[in-house]
Amino acid sequence: MTHALLIGNPNCGKTTLFNALTNANQRVGNWPGVTVEKKTGEFLLGEHLIEITDLPGVYSLVANAEGISQDEQIAAQSVIDLEYDCIINVIDACHLERHLYLTSQLFELGKPVVVALNMMDIAEHRGISIDTEKLESLLGCSVIPIQAHKNIGIPALQQSLLHCSQKIKPLKLSLSVAAQQILNDLENQLISKGYKNSFAYYFSRRLAEGDTLIGEKAFTESLLIKLQETEQNLDVLLADARYQKIHEIVTLVQKKHSDASEHFTAKLDKLVLHRFLALPIFFAMMYLMFLFAINIGGAFQDFFDISTETIFVQGSGWLLQQLHAPNWVIALVANGVGKGINTTITFIPVIAAMFFFLSLLETSGYMARAAFVVDKAMRAMGLPGKSFVPMIVGFGCNVPAIMAARTLDSERDRLLTVMMSPFMSCSARLAIYAVFVAAFFPSGGHNVVFSLYLIGILMAVFTGYILRKTTLKGHASPLILELPAYHRPSLRRLLRETSLRLRFFVYRAGKLIIPICVILGGLNAITWGGGISSGEANTDSLLSIIGQWITPLFAPMGIHQDNWPATVGLLTGMLAKEVVVGTLNSLYAQVGHVGEIAAAHFDFWGGIKAAFGSIPANLSELGSALWNPVSASAADSELSQSVYGIMSRRFDGAVGAYAYLLFVLLYIPCVSTMAVIRQEANKRFMWTSIVWSFVVAYTTSVVFYQGAKFLDHPQQSMIWILAMSLSLLFVLAVFRYSQYGMGRQNAAANT
């Protein structure tokens, strides 16, 4: 077996190459001692097994104690600690000179290296030609030109891994005699300490460049003190010598003609990064994303809803009825398992459209610019602009958004981002928004969704600001981020990335929704006395009693006693937001006897025909749906219309529905998010996030509802608004004067 490390700069196409090499044979875990994700994969070449470990993207192998992210520490440490046979160094052919800096450091390890020269087609399009044979001769290692996104050059790269036993000699750098002598002395001291010759050579260069995390701390610190006494600028001299050598190589192997794409990127950036137009363009892009998800995705929602409703809910109910099964069994299977499957599959098109648009923004190069656009506004409040990149990831799911915070250099910035990310509207919340928009907002539904996303962003910024003034005081680190050139992503790549994200989401949602729906069906069938109900609408069931007992707590935000299913939806939503829609569908259907009607009038072929007929009907109305997105999102089946009708009667109109959505937006996303906060920060931050999110959600929802209903009962509304305002001020005071000192605690101490 051959074990290869995959390493390269950020945005070099490393992950695309990893996917091309390993396909579905991948494993995801964590690096030892930290929560940074570790990706490994393997593939067979004949009878030879090759294992690939994907290291985090880095610009350099120098690891300092401060000013470096966990990802960079992992990459720098892995090339030393892991057992491997060779290194695959992925280089962006469009930025050869910049990427060869990391290559020059890898050569100093003395390990076999294969250079994968990626994005050759893009380089040619930009007028860049590279003599790969000459580059191979000058570097002394295999150089394989590839196009990872098109699978071009992958077989040649795979073959090169079978013949990568030749060790690489470091590049000869032009250093002064004094500087070279210092490096030799460092190397000899390391050898005398027991280091192997190859590692001693590598460590001496890292120490000279200011690496403080290698070797034994006491020994390396003593060497660094001596180094500073003899030559304080050795790190600068080394970097300069590297760039001189790299420039010589690039001059010999690369020819660059006029670059039309660079001119295009520069011209487009003048507009996208314009001082006054940048923010409006950013909000316009976000707005287009919601329009696309609600309308284009919603056009296919009826097909999934009607077809799965016909097969899994009505079909299973009819079949069990023919078998003379008890009503509680029909309710458990049809409105439990069947409704769970129906709910999971129904919101696939909206979520898929969301993921597709996010992938388009990321691969086109705009997402990196979004961080720069919001950087100035966020830094004015002392918040890191770079944190907005993980927060945008939160539009898909809060869990990877929080995990992406590990790429931030500052511990303070990382913790701020971890605490801010849960307020970003994830795709699971979008499924809830789509249902309520269809039921309560017959026009301008996309504006409602946009407002919720905007409120989530503002609340995240507000949370960061409060933490900056209390437990996480300090200054935001400067934003240093590479702006990639604009790309025209292929449809195949977009569909593949969308498919990977969607598959993970549906699997995660389905394994939660279906069991929850079964449990809810069971609780709704079991009475308080322990008996089994024979009907579907049972006000004496355990579920009904629990919901009715808790519902008065939510009365100030417009949830009345008869709307207890909405309360149960909030409770199950703490497990996962994907479950809320399934909970509401299941409970409202049971309360309204919808399942009985569906079973009595079951028409399989009629349902399938209606499902397929909904696609052209919705697509033909797409133009008007851009102004009225509900027409693309609402379900046309009798069952869906019945559920929407029950919902519209139970909630206090559009005001009550919007107050409910505000609570859904702001309270904890799911237990998975809380667990990740526990891992990425610590237990104290997790509980702080839980308490803060509930306080903010309850206060915002109550203040909105009471403010909207102020004319109906001014005295009552005024009391509630004042009470909520005072409660929020009290919580802020606790944050301000807290003696816990969360920001001083080691975030890795998970005790």
Curated annotation (Swiss-Prot):
Q: Which residues cross the membrane?
A: 276-296, 341-361, 385-405, 422-442, 447-467, 512-532, 539-559, 657-677, 685-705, 715-735
Main localization is membrane
Q: Which residues hold GTP 2?
A: G33, V34, T35, V36, E37
Function recorded in the entry: Probable transporter of a GTP-driven Fe(2+) uptake system.
User: What is the scientific name of the source organism?
Assistant: Legionella pneumophila (strain Paris)
Location in the cell reads: Cell inner membrane
Which positions does UniProt annotate for GTP 1 binding? G8, N9, P10, N11, C12, G13, K14, T15
**Listed InterPro entries:** Fe2_transport_prot-B, Fe2_transport_prot_B_C, FeoB_GTPase, G_FEOB_dom, Gate_dom, GTP-bd, P-loop_NTPase
Task: Output the Gene Ontology cellular-component terms.
Answer: plasma membrane
Q: What stretch or stretches form a coiled coil here? A: none
Protein family? Belongs to the TRAFAC class TrmE-Era-EngA-EngB-Septin-like GTPase superfamily. FeoB GTPase (TC 9.A.8) family.
Which stretches make up the FeoB-type G domain? 1-167
Protein name, entry field: Fe(2+) transporter FeoB
Q: How does it sit in the membrane?
A: Multi-pass membrane protein
